[in-house]
Amino acid sequence: MSKDTLFDKVWDLHKVSSLPGGSDQIFIGLHLIHEVTSPQAFGALKDKNLRVKFPSRTVATVDHIVPTDNQSRPFKDNLAEQMIETLEKNCIEHKIRFFNIGSGNQGIVHVVAPELGLTQPGMTIACGDSHTSTHGAFGSIAFGIGTSQVRDVLATQTIAMNKLKVRQIWCENKLSNGVYAKDLVLHIINKLGVKAGVGFAYEFAGPAINSLSMEERMTICNMSIEGGARCGYINPDEKTFSYIKNKLCAPRNENWDEALLWWKSLKSDANSIYDDVTKIDASKVEPTVTWGITPGQSVGINQKIPLLEELSPDDQFVAKEAYEYMGFKPGQSIKDTPIDVCFIGSCTNGRISDLRVAAKVVKDKKVSQNIKAFVVPGSEKVAKEAKIEGLDKIFLDAGFQWREPGCSMCLAMNSDKLIGNQLSASSSNRNFKGRQGSPNGRTLLMSPAMVAAAAISGKVTDIRNFM
């Protein structure tokens, strides 16, 4: 087993007890909730006449089902309105901080918590959402949980978990111009596989990771789950501390000094023992695009969709399904594939830096004819900053739709959906069958810059041609 890694240290600090059967009871420092996975958990508490154990350690917002075209209340979608009302009532009853629409701080939970300074090094963080691993970018141990575990955390502030193994993914060198964090993480998942991380925490490290901004690091950790890992994390450094400083919920004055001293001690030791170490040469990563029905089915922009015989027996089975569903042929080039819809947003790539990069690509250009393109800021704070910088106008002038914050077409639990077998270029995190709202809808995952380039050209295009 691993030893003296950041994961081991944070786990041991939060371990309450060892349980029969080999699992541990782990204290959760921060519990994030939203409108979709919390109602049943609150209902279970009510049935047992229980209260939330530590309301101050729970924070709520709305993101999954909220409309992004019109957020006037009541919503047109009765279910969405009902779910928001339920969360509002539960937060009032249990005295939980709630960042609702119009508060200035509402948005996708994994965008909101970091930008408010709620996410901090050394924490254990849980949320009823798969992409909670995002917060590991700050040196926290963060993982998604199911509704029954949401109930457990609300009631006890703890959950039962088996300790994970730790795989270090050492990323050598640096990314080339026009290659982004999204490309790197898609490349990693392709090389290791979508099941390689099962039972593991991923520690992302090395010169390529160190060179990334905090928002780029969040993109990397966000998609850990797509590689099978329960969580992913990065050792905190000066970039981490600078990002958190002066945020709304960050420590202040002498509390800051005390927190900073502790945070600086939180890192894997130089002689840490890992269960596995994998090396990736970041300088060889190209702009990367998925072609199939899992995030692991991707190719560089100048590569071709793999032939069946080039794949392992296990991968061949899924590849056959992907060829048929996506309408691609083995050996086909992904470049120049015509696109129907372009979506920039999500907890993976809906932050201000993502919008800046995409706006730079589309400035003074026009969206290709017959392309539906839209931008969904990850939070109200992101939307406000984008408007101050004039990014919304750049997108609107180019022919994009500018929406209100929410998860939007990432999971299409709202009104943003593909139609028929439309093909989308998406900056989100999952390309599963039907993920974006239509049973036959198809998704190509890529960086926001690549989505922007696809919107302008009407097809999958090498972003480096726009530079």
UniProtKB/Swiss-Prot annotation:
Enzyme nomenclature, EC number: 4.2.1.33
Matches recorded under PROSITE patterns: ACONITASE_1 (PS00450), ACONITASE_2 (PS01244)
Residues annotated as binding [4Fe-4S] cluster: 347, 407, 410
GO MF term list: 3-isopropylmalate dehydratase activity; 4 iron, 4 sulfur cluster binding; metal ion binding
Database matches in InterPro entries: 3-IsopropMal_deHydase_lsu, Acnase/IPM_dHydase_lsu_aba_1/3, Acoase/IPM_deHydtase_lsu_aba, Aconitase_4Fe-4S_BS, Aconitase_4Fe-4S_dom, IPM_dehydratase_rel_enz, IPMI_cat
Pathways involved: Amino-acid biosynthesis; L-leucine biosynthesis; L-leucine from 3-methyl-2-oxobutanoate: step 2/4
Record's signal peptide: none
Keyword tags: 4Fe-4S, Amino-acid biosynthesis, Branched-chain amino acid biosynthesis, Iron, Iron-sulfur, Leucine biosynthesis, Lyase, Metal-binding
Root EC class: lyase
Listed Pfam families: Aconitase
Cofactor needs: [4Fe-4S] cluster
Cofactor annotation remark: Binds 1 [4Fe-4S] cluster per subunit.
UniProt key word Metal-binding: yes
GO biological process assignments: L-leucine biosynthetic process
Domain of life: Bacteria
Catalytically driven reaction(s): (2R,3S)-3-isopropylmalate = (2S)-2-isopropylmalate
Entry similarity comment: Belongs to the aconitase/IPM isomerase family. LeuC type 1 subfamily.
Complexes and interactors: Heterodimer of LeuC and LeuD.
HAMAP family cross-referenced by the UniProt entry: LeuC_type1 (MF_01026)
Function recorded in the entry: Catalyzes the isomerization between 2-isopropylmalate and 3-isopropylmalate, via the formation of 2-isopropylmaleate.
Protein name from the UniProt record: 3-isopropylmalate dehydratase large subunit
Organism, scientific name: Prochlorococcus marinus (strain MIT 9301)
